[in-house]
Structure formats: structure tokens, C-alpha cells
Amino acid sequence: MSNDKRTIYVGGLADEVTERLLNNAFIPFGDIADIQMPADYESQRHRGFAFIEYEQSEDAAAAIDNMNDSELCGRTIRVNLAKPVRVKEDSFKPIWADDDWLQKHAGATLQPEGEPEAEKVETPSTGPAVIEKAEKRNPQVFFDIRIGGNDAGRIVMLLRADVVPKTAENFRQLCTHEQGYGYKGCSFHRVIPEFMCQGGDFTNNNGTGGKSIYGKKFNDENFNLKHNSFGTLSMANSGANTNGSQFFICTTKTDWLDNKHVVFGHVISGAEVVRKMERCGSKSGTPSQKIVIYSCGELK
């Protein structure tokens, strides 16, 4: 794995996190060259951290900006720039096998042996804070989904308030019901396999209704974010500047929608739930089973 500014360290991972889940959570920021999850050879489980190498250093920086201190599988993760030590040219030992390296660069993954508790209090638990920002981090919201009356799981989404603040705030408040209305009880009325799952019409549940927190409709904010991967979260519309409450989750790359629909976030957890929803779809868009958001809100 490369040791330049294209490689990031992801720590604090829950046991159930897999390489595929990491790929789904981090690929919205750019093309990924490699993912490595060092294993504990006794337990055969990963050691609670991973290294992700991007094709471009700018994409790695974007991943750090958006994913550090975010939630993945119920745990807050740390995302920093990986800072490997120099190794001999003839050494095939991976950098993460060196405990000295882990103590310096892997946050609170390891503690030095015999360290007194008083000293531990003084040691930062979050490791090397490569980027410290005072501004508010991008919000995370969730949908708890039922399919055919049965619980299907939770989808967690990161909203890009740093790029499209107005659109992200609309979606956030519709998840929290701060205005007295929103997505709770709303259905996904249109699902097309290998394309997208559309919902958000909480007034008619058929694609003809819904409203934003700003009124019935509001203008397109910008088209800076693209429909570049599975899990992209974008606004549905009936033409330019007709955004309301309806949205869709892409199940594949849909770049023909770029500059026509406003992308405002992406799925960071619950990809398997989106796939369950997708399997209920049809070419016409009519789901074979009712897909309902039975609970929703913001993760703090």
C-alpha cells in the first residue's frame, strides 16, 4: 500500500465492519486503489482499524474532512492521514505490524505496557488529529426500514451541508420532523433495480406530493456533487428548480443525472438494506412489497 498522502487510517471500527462496507462508505469521495484491514491472527478478526488508499490525494483529504468523527455501525470512527515510518528496503513487514507505529499513528488502538492511569488521562484518545476544525461537522441522519411489514434494518446517511447547506438542511429537518411533518411513515413508491429507490412523498405516497421546509418547492442549490456511485443521495424533481421533499438513493452510478438533480449526501451504513429494497423493485418502478420508513431522525 502506498505511503503518501493518498492513504488514510480509519480507526475505531466495530467487529461487523467489512472491507465491502468500508468501500461503500468511502468510495463517494473518489476512486479507491486498495483497502487493507490487518487481522489478529489468534481471533482471525480485524484489529479495529484499516488503511484505505485513494487514487488521488485530494480524494483522501475529502474523506478525512467528511468521515472523521462520523458514525459507522454504531461507533464513532477516527479518520486521519496515515503516517508510516521508514522501513528497510529488504523488509516485507507491513507498517501496521510495528507496535511503535501504531502507538504513534493509530489513535487509542494500543496503549504502552505499564502506562499509569494518570498518564493515560493526559494522552489524547483520538490520536493524531491531522485536521482540527471548529466548524460544525456534516450531519448524519437515519431511516429505519420495514419491507412487507418486517424490519429490514437501518440506513445511515451523511448529508453534505458543506456543499449544499440548504438542501441538506431540508432533508435533515424532514428526518427530525422539526416542522411537524416529514418522512416518518413515508413509503418508497418507485424502485427500479440497477437504478434507484425513490421516496419522500409523505402526503400522497405516489410521487405526486410532498413539500419542503421552505414551501412547496425550492430552487436547485448547485450541481457540484455527482451521481458517481452506489448510495448517492439526490433530490427528485419535475424539472429545474422544483425540489420538494422527494429524493432517491442510487443503487449504481447514474452520471446521466449530473447537472439535472442536486446530490446532497450518500449512504455510509446500511448498504445491505438498500439492496433489500432494490430487490423489491421492477422495471415499471412499482415495488413488489411495501417499503416504509417507520422511524427516522438525526444521529448526534
Curated annotation (Swiss-Prot):
CDD domains: cyclophilin_ABH_like, RRM_PPIE
SUPFAM superfamilies per record: Cyclophilin-like, RNA-binding domain, RBD
SMART domains found in the cross-reference section: RRM, RRM_1
Localization (cell): Nucleus
Gene3D superfamilies in the record: 3.30.70.330, Cyclophilin-like
GO cellular component, one term: precatalytic spliceosome
EC number: 5.2.1.8
PROSITE patterns hit by this protein: CSA_PPIASE_1 (PS00170), CSA_PPIASE_2 (PS50072), RRM (PS50102)
Sequence ranges assigned to domain PPIase cyclophilin-type in this UniProt record: 142-298
Segment forming the signal sequence: none
Recorded catalytic activity of this chain's protein: [protein]-peptidylproline (omega=180) = [protein]-peptidylproline (omega=0)
Domain RRM residue range list: 6-84
Matches recorded under InterPro entries: Cyclophilin-like_dom_sf, Cyclophilin-type_PPIase_CS, Cyclophilin-type_PPIase_dom, Nucleotide-bd_a/b_plait_sf, PPIE, PPIE_RRM, RBD_domain_sf, RRM_dom
Family according to the record: Belongs to the cyclophilin-type PPIase family. PPIase E subfamily.
Name under which the protein is recorded: Peptidyl-prolyl cis-trans isomerase E
Organism name: Drosophila melanogaster (Fruit fly)
Lineage: Eukaryota, Metazoa, Ecdysozoa, Arthropoda, Hexapoda
Gene name tied to this protein: cyp33
